[in-house]
């Protein structure tokens, strides 16, 4: 196995009236999964800038950050290489946009769900940890 690669990503969790916005996308195994919008930091970009950009690209909503929410650190294997990933999550509110994803080839669907319903749809440990945090907001 080759040396470990490091990746930094950021994402946003839009919470409105007790519901969160989830996106459906394809994971590395080719399966459709529900998750929160996120993506890699571009060179020179802060985590906050990346989160706002990714949420707008993947949901069509321009959002403002309300607070730092969660940090996930985990490792996984991709094409025989170990990747150490660091993801910063921000709590956001909608401030404009049309709700039409700018990356329709990546996003299959979007839906608003209550925290309880979202918990039943989400598979990733970090996403479920975010739901647990939001229950106490």
Region annotations inferred by a language model:
Residues 41-67, 72-129:
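Unchanged
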Residues 21-22, 41, 122, 134:
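Generic leucine side-chain signal with a strong bias for well-ordered alpha-helical environments
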């Amino acid at each position: 196995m080759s040396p470990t690669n490091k990746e930094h990503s950021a994402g946003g969790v839009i919470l409105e009236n007790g519901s969160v916005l989830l996106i459906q996308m394809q994971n590395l195994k080719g399966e459709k999964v529900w998750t929160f919008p996120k993506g890699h930091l571009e060179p020179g970009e802060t985590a906050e800038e990346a989160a706002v950009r990714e949420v707008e690209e993947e949901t069509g909503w321009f959002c403002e950050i309300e607070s730092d929410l969660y940090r996930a650190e985990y490792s996984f294997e991709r094409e025989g290489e170990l990747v150490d990933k660091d993801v910063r999550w921000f709590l956001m509110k909608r401030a404009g946009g049309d709700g039409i994803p700018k990356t329709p080839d990546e996003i299959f669907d979007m839906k608003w769900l209550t925290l309880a319903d979202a918990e039943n749809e989400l598979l990733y440990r970090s996403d479920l940890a975010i739901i647990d945090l939001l229950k106490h907001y």
